[in-house]
Amino acid sequence: ILYSHDDMYFLPKWDYFLINKVKQINSKKFYFSSIMINGDPNLKGHLNLFAGDTLENFDEKKLLENYQNLEHDDFQGSTWAPHLIHKELWNKVGGFSEEFSPGAGSDPDLNMKLWNEGVRIFQCLSKSRVYHFGSVTIRKKNKNFFKKNQGSLANKIFLLKWGMSIKTFKKFYLRSHFIHNNPL
């Protein structure tokens, strides 16, 4: 199952790198993600190259000429979309949990369900790339509701459900934000 946001532009060979990695590991217990190139300079933690933030100002030529020049390592601990997981695993854990809708906290929650099923590969493949326009759908929604859900509400739901914060799970279990490729 490949999960993606509705505001992503998939760059050449994005799928090749994901499929190749799946073939290499010979396991159904994985979570592979592509790295996002952000069109919104306020988003941190990804690659940055402004090629537009709407369909109207999208500079496809600029993006295609420059995306391969951006450097980043592969790393473990990813919770980013787009991500690829085996269909059997997706069905076993029930996919995304509805209590996190419209999305805030849903990725770490899915990762926790996968962790509890024994998944220890949560790898972002830096050569598999997408351009992210910056939460276009969410920008159209009630900003006060999303801001509340994005932060404290999502963290509270996660804490009550799993007995730890999203930050604790990402830091001590997934070891997110560190460049490493060893099993967790």
Per-range role (PLM):
Residues 37-39, 101, 123-145:
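Active-site donor/metal-binding and catalytic loop motifs
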